[in-house]
Amino acid sequence: MRFLKALPRRAEVQYDCLDRTLETQENVNLNIRVNVKEVATWGVNTCIISLKGLDNADDRFVLPEVNTALALFPLSIAADCLLMLPCISVVMSISSVMKSVTVE
């Protein structure tokens, strides 16, 4: 996918990994936005794919409004492509999700 090569990399980031959030439900999106902003303060590169863009996000890809059932397919394909990048550690992502769920 062409947009993956355009993602910026910061030299000061300790872990060469990008946090990504794929969100289609706008009622949950606000809570996710707060979490993404908190992660960004840690110095992690973020890539947000959402129905509505964020004003201060480093990378944002706004999805057109479609039926939720149809939105799952492109998001699943995008998630699979993103996880195949060499900088992504699935174990690290799973442990991060588990910590996030435990805290909330």
UniProtKB/Swiss-Prot annotation:
Transmembrane stretches, by residue range? Answer: 81-97
Locations listed in the record:
Cell membrane
Which Gene Ontology cellular-component terms appear in the entry? plasma membrane
Tell me how this protein sits in the membrane. Single-pass membrane protein
Keywords annotated in UniProt: Cell membrane, Membrane, Transmembrane, Transmembrane helix
Protein name (database record) = Uncharacterized protein YbcM
Provide the species name. Bacillus subtilis (strain 168)
